[in-house]
Amino acid sequence: MKQLKPNSKYLLYGQALSFMGDYCVLPALLILSTYYHDYWVTSGVIVVRSIPMVFQPFLGVLVDRLDRIKIMLWTDIIRGIIFLGLTFLPKGEYPLIFLALLFITYGSGVFFNPARLAVMSSLESDIKSINTLFAKATTISIIVGAAAGGLFLLGGSVELAVAFNGVTYLVSAFFISRIKLQFVPIQSENIKEAFQSFKEGLKEIKTNSFVLNAMFTMITMALLWGVVYSYFPIVSRFLGDGEIGNFILTFCIGFGGFIGAALVSKWGFNNNRGLTYFTVLSIVSLALFLFTPIFAVSVIAAILFFIAMEYGEVLAKVKVQENAANQIQGRIFSVAEASIGLCISIGSMFINILSAPVIMGLIVVIVCGLFLHTKLVNKSFLERDNKTEQKGVF
């Protein structure tokens, strides 16, 4: 950390605080949505948070032509002001205004990530260090953010958690304003070429069974994420007045993810043991989460669920990186990013149109389908490796 240059430190400080605010405000927004007494509003919170991801793959075209520091700066300022403004909106009133303001904040936020990644690539010798530290800071920020939100709620106001998020964005903007990088515009592909790249990514997914399996894994997990997010307010009711439970469950995201990341090397890649652990954990943890009336059991189920999701995410990314040409990977991940945002939104709406047993049955069918497809792909992977080794011997 001490070896980092000032620009790298400012970026890391700002993002750690901003990410902390994100996971402090997520449960707070879910709590505020329950005051409307309509689960479509709860689903709406998740949809407006996720659906802008569909457009993110095409934003690199704009980011490459504009000053990335200014994009990050103004995005954080806009988000900070709107979140502070949300605290003045009466609870349970004006649902369309509530969702519209959230859509503006998360919609503007999709410009931020491409700009941040581009800035990180300009940090020269600090690139590896900043990426490693950012990954660690992400997990810690989720845990600390959820804990901070819980403390605000115990202090008597869920709006404080929303205000805290607004403040973290403004503090992040302050650090970003101190980053000194010379802006060099890049003449990147136009919109038509961006769509062509997207189509090439789709073509690779269709023709490469390993990449198709990675995509299947990512969209399955996105559906599961949407379902679990939408059930946070319901499950939280089994603890007191139900509000503090949302923050505890958000804490489980970071804690489960931390454990899941540590288990990746032990469970292994492209083998049936890890696949079995992932499948069993996903189904059992989700069933417990949806049906148990005991909050402590729900917490354990949530941790197990997020362990499985972290493992699956790493597995899917590695499968793309190992089995697709380097020049096509960005296009594949662009398709994945858009699909994930769409599937989280779809999963979050199941609660409004399907009963819990039907949702669970649908998830079991999808996850079992993924299990069978992955098993076939793993077999192909082993056969390919064996052929490569035999050629090496001769």
Swiss-Prot record:
Q: What would be an example GO MF term here?
A: transmembrane transporter activity
Q: Enumerate the UniProt keywords alphabetically.
A: Cell membrane, Membrane, Transmembrane, Transmembrane helix, Transport
Show the coiled coil region(s).
none
Its main subcellular localisation, reduced to a broad class, is membrane
Which SUPFAM superfamilies does UniProt cross-reference here? MFS general substrate transporter
Q: Which domain of life is it from?
A: Bacteria
Membrane topology for this entry? Multi-pass membrane protein
Report the transmembrane regions from the record.
Answer: 11-31, 43-63, 69-89, 92-112, 142-162, 166-186, 215-235, 244-264, 288-308, 332-352, 353-373
Per its UniProt record, what InterPro entries does this chain match? Bacilysin_exporter_BacE_put, MFS, MFS_trans_sf
Q: Where in the cell is it found?
A: Cell membrane
Q: What else is known?
A: The compound ppGpp is essential for the transcription of the bacABCDE operon and GTP regulates the transcription of both this operon and ywfH via the CodY-mediated regulation system.
The record's annotation in PANTHER family points to: BACILYSIN EXPORTER BACE-RELATED, MACROLIDE-EFFLUX PROTEIN
The task this protein performs is described as: Part of the bacilysin biosynthesis operon. May be involved in self-resistance to bacilysin by permitting efflux of this antibiotic.
Indicate the family of this protein.
Belongs to the major facilitator superfamily. Drug:H(+) antiporter-3 (DHA3) (TC 2.A.1.21) family.
**Name of this protein:** Putative bacilysin exporter BacE
